């Protein structure tokens, strides 16, 4: 099994990578402002089986919101509904501020291609986070340190090649004999950009969709699969993330049900220091 250990960057190489710009992720999520719409382009570096990686699409939408001149505060939540396939090439983002008050903003984003129907529909909430009482009842899941875990072998999809997945528990065993009963859909793993990049809201958004489909774990095989609707909640702002100063997250994901072609997924993204950065949930289609 090729685990890429020989190609893992040394510490000095990692530092050098962090200084290089632009990162492939930033190139893939670049948007430009037009007269009334924002424009972006799909990236071959973040491609899935039949379209762009949904996490990169969501991060691109979030970038358009963060870069918008009317934006105030930090993201609290982003919901992305993948309405139709996205073709390779350029796309337009119609970004609208729906409602704003002194502390929060509500946004709507529609993605179209070539003047056609809406391919992706998103809603977002931004807010000014103010000092308050804080309490985190949940604790960081136990995990072998990142440096003591092996990288997961790369798969055919180009987007997978952009991440370093290191499973602590629940590594998918593709190619093994199908189980007589469904296996556990739970997994715990470290996720980082293969070329190190400081974790920010954009990378959190993308990583929240970087879990392999839960059905792949339960059935020990790849089946036709696609996210229909994804929501990610952010529990830190830009200042919190800057203080964490990290390039990797500890991620956990699980599912509660697979039924009549649809299954759920819930996940958490943690900093190595034990801070819960984001939680996420989605509903996905499968054919099996």
Predicted feature residues:
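Accessible peptide chain termini
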Residues: 1-2, 17
């Amino acid at each position: 099994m090729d685990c890429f250990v020989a190609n893992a960057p040394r510490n000095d190489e990692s530092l050098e990578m962090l200084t290089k710009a632009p990162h492939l992720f930033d190139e893939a999520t670049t948007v430009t402002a037009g007269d009334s719409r924002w424009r972006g382009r799909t990236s071959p570096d973040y491609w899935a089986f039949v379209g762009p990686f949904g996490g990169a699409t969501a991060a691109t939408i979030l970038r358009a919101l963060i870069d918008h001149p009317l934006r105030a505060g930090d993201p609290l939540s982003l919901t992305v509904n993948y309405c139709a396939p996205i073709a390779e090439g350029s796309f337009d983002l119609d970004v609208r501020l729906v409602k704003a008050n002194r502390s929060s903003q509500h946004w709507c984003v529609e993605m179209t291609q070539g003047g056609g129907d809406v391919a992706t529909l998103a809603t977002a909430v931004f807010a000014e986070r103010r000092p308050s009482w804080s309490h985190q009842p949940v604790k960081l899941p136990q995990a072998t340190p990142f440096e003591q875990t092996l990288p997961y072998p790369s798969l055919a999809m180009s987007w997978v090649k952009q991440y370093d997945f290191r499973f602590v528990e629940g590594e998918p065993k593709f190619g093994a004999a199908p189980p007589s009963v469904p296996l556990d859909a739970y997994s715990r793993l470290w996720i980082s950009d293969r070329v190190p990049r400081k974790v920010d809201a954009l990378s959190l958004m993308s990583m929240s969709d970087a879990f392999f489909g839960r059905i792949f774990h339960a059935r020990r095989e790849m089946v036709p699969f696609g996210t229909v609707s994804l929501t990610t909640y952010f529990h830190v702002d830009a200042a919190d993330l800057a203080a964490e100063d990290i390039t990797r997250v500890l991620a956990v994901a699980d599912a509660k049900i697979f039924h009549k072609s649809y299954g759920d997924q819930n996940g958490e993204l943690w900093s190595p220091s034990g801070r819960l950065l984001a939680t996420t949930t989605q509903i996905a289609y499968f054919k099996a």
